[in-house]
UniProtKB/Swiss-Prot annotation:
It comes from Alkaliphilus oremlandii (strain OhILAs) (Clostridium oremlandii (strain OhILAs)). The active site is at residue 16. GO terms for molecular function: ATP binding; magnesium ion binding; selenide, water dikinase activity. This is Selenide, water dikinase. SUPFAM superfamilies: PurM C-terminal domain-like (SSF56042), PurM N-terminal domain-like (SSF55326). The keyword Transferase applies.
Length: 346
């Protein structure tokens, strides 16, 4: 058994950058049978973060799963990041996780102690979330992969969908972008220690705390920023909600080092497919540096929440977020009536 191989060198892509591109997904999902059930609150149609099924007037189940390849070489840290990413979908729907189950793909050439550390990292994040880890499933694979299937709960009338953004709302982003670029640098072993530590801190932080800061405020819609990049998820929110969204490019928080690395051309392949998928739906209203534009399409791993909130509650939201440990949050846009383009970047 080889204990010295770097986990990130055993995979083609790292983290959420390993997802199939949005164009491919659209092709394979387009002719699946449509599900009609009066209790299905959120299903496939709006490309949301999780499914929501009404059990009774006071409770709905949230169901989601997520897994990916290593973004770091330390197995415990990888487990933490993968679990935080999986749990995020429940918070993005306005709910709380109840139970979690491990999803594991693991090469037989690696020491089982490595898998033990991955699972410990995941278990500690599940414990932090307040959910229960109740089982899982493993298969042998050439590339290591790890994540969770999560069941959560939410009140049926308090679901945060990605398709219900309200005209006049403002958008808050609760974590910086640029994680795909940093993960590419980490995989290539060119990230500095400061860049590595910064990326790990952002990716391993649960979105639980941002959710709790906002859960009692007037939120109309929410999604988490992952593999389709910041603008990709903004587009999904605009399209699903029948609105246009204006993004303040200079207000989008960037993780330290991301702009410099992007300027050097350290860009994950997923950025290009993300941009190709929606570039005809995005209008740049002014010149933007190439590196900044790339970062707006950069596939994120365990990114932040993008929250549509009323102007009335915006001050309370910002104050509440300022009271929690945060990696950086910002007002990044506003919701407009539907116009010629889904997304306007200024």
């Amino acid at each position: 058994m080889n204990q010295n191989r770097r986990l990130t060198q055993m995979t083609k892509s790292a983290g959420u950058a390993a997802k199939l591109g949005p164009d491919v997904l659209a092709q394979v999902l387009c002719d699946l049978p449509k599900i009609e059930d009066p209790n299905l609150i959120v299903g496939l149609e709006t490309s949301d973060d999780a499914a929501v099924y009404k059990i009774n007037d006071d409770m709905a189940l949230i169901q989601t799963l997520d897994f990916f390849t290593p973004v770091v070489d330390d197995p415990y840290t990888y487990g933490q990041i993968a679990a935080a990413n999986s749990l995020s979908d429940v918070y993005a729907m306005g709910g709380r996780p109840l139970t979690a189950m491990n999803i594991v793909c693991f090469p037989n050439c690696l020491d089982p102690k490595i898998l033990n550390q991955i699972l410990k990292g995941g278990a500690d994040k599940v414990l932090e979330s307040g959910a229960l880890l109740v089982g899982g499933h493993t298969v042998e694979d050439d590339e290591p992969k790890y994540g969770l299937s999560i069941t959560g709960i939410v009140h049926p009338k308090k679901v945060w969908a990605n398709s219900t953004a309200r005209e006049g709302d403002y958008l808050i982003l609760t974590k910086p972008v640029g994680l795909g670029v940093l993960n590419t640098a980490i995989k290539a072993d060119i990230a500095t220690k400061e860049q590595y530590d910064g990326a790990v801190k952002v990716m391993s932080m649960l979105n639980k705390y941002a959710f709790e800061a906002l859960e009692n405020l007037d939120v109309s819609a929410c999604t988490d920023i992952t593999g389709f990049g910041f603008l990709g998820h903004v587009y999904e929110m605009a399209k699903g909600s029948g609105v246009s969204i204006e993004i303040f490019a200079d207000k989008v928080p960037l993780i330290d080092g991301a702009k410099e690395l992007a300027t050097m051309g350290i860009i994950p392949a997923g950025m290009y497919s993300n941009k190709k998928h929606i570039e005809n739906e995005v209008l740049k209203e002014q010149d933007i540096e190439d590196a900044i534009e790339d970062l707006l399409y950069d596939p994120q791993t365990s990114g932040g929440l993008l929250v549509s909130i009323s102007e009335k509650d915006l001050p309370d939201a910002l104050e509440n977020l300022s009271l929690i440990e945060s990696n950086g949050f910002s007002v990044v846009g506003r919701v407009l009536p539907r116009s010629d383009y889904a997304v306007y970047v200024k």
